C-alpha cells in the first residue's frame, strides 16, 4: 500500500526542490519543519510522508 503524503510548500507556495533523490537530509529537515517525521526527494521535489494537504506554508 502506498503511504499517504504530500509535497510541502514554502512560504511562497512553492515546492522544495532537491537534487539528491531518495533519502535526503535537506528534505528530512523540511518535513520536520512541517511537523512530520519522514520524507525524501522524489522527482526533484521534497515529499513528506503523512503530510496533510499543505495549506499552511512555512
From Swiss-Prot:
The UniProt record lists the keyword Disulfide bond: yes
Domain LCN-type CS-alpha/beta, first and last residues per copy: 3-58
GO MF entries: sodium channel inhibitor activity; toxin activity
CC annotations in GO: extracellular region
InterPro entries assigned: LCN-type_CS_alpha_beta_dom, Scorpion_toxin-like_sf, Scorpion_toxinL/defensin
Tissue-level expression: Expressed by the venom gland.
Disulfide bonds: 18-41, 27-46, 31-48
Main location: secreted
Keywords, in A-Z order: Disulfide bond, Ion channel impairing toxin, Neurotoxin, Secreted, Toxin, Voltage-gated sodium channel impairing toxin
Protein name per Swiss-Prot or TrEMBL: Birtoxin
Species this protein is from: Parabuthus transvaalicus
